[in-house]
């Protein structure tokens, strides 16, 4: 009997599962205004919906249940604010749009977790700066210095401990982990080099699949590359190859985003003269049996396979039965070009 009741409950839940969720907005000082909700798909921004407010400034936003991520709400093409979408029905109230901090969001656990997370992050980074300054000043007083070092370690873990404390089903957990890492990496390069190794662990713990609708992928791969290229030379390429493996594997079920990330990362690696990592990424994608590359990706990556060190370049047909190899000239100038080159 218990099994039958459980089955009926599961069937009922499936029947009444929501396909869409709504956000009820009220901006009393902006009646008859146009609203646009924009989300992300990989690197691309896309319009999720458009709507208008009535004469009282009230409006309704509807978003699909399968869109889990961030979105930007634009009003009249100008004012915007960050929203989190994860199968929640909630309300917005904004009396004065010139005061972003005054926007009230009720009924969203995602947004509440985000606000607390950003507050924790800002407080921790501010305290960290002070403690990092004090530690070397007390080099002659080891007892006091150890007190500051211990406090420094505690403060350094404040934000990550908060993120880890969030429930697994809160999507903003992944967003905060990624956004925090993006914000911290440049500071670690410039001011806190001792913190850099922990960022490698944090990067490898990120769920890339969960970032599909985050709008953070571009900043993440660029920031991590910028961080790692400042490691000792013998560590740079192993760390980059490890990161490339992670991204390619985690996006194997989404070839469009996989190629988008790979193309951008490849170009970024080349622009930073990290050619060995660029070659590794190119060959990884070309040998990826789970993904059919589009023309742009194939053209971009093939240059490393065809022009790899040790390969013999193909002879060039110059017409009239003449080839480059047959020319007896002492000097030969060969200019290469391709239709995909800008």
Residue ranges and their predicted role:
Residues 1-26:
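Bacterial Sec-dependent N-terminal signal peptides
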Residues 18-203, 207-209:
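A non-transmembrane, solvent-exposed segment enriched in polar/low-complexity residues
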Residues 150-156, 234-242, 273-277:
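Helix-turn-helix repeat elements of alpha-solenoid scaffolds
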Residues 171-175, 253, 257-260, 273, ...:
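Structural signature of alpha-solenoid helical repeat junctions
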Residues 178-257:
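Charged, long alpha-helical assembly modules
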Residues 281-289:
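TPR/TPR-like (Sel1-like) alpha-helical repeat modules
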Residues 290-325:
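N-terminal "domain-start" segment that seeds a small globular fold
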Residues 322-342:
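Short active-site neighborhood of thiol/selenol oxidoreductases, capturing the structured segment around
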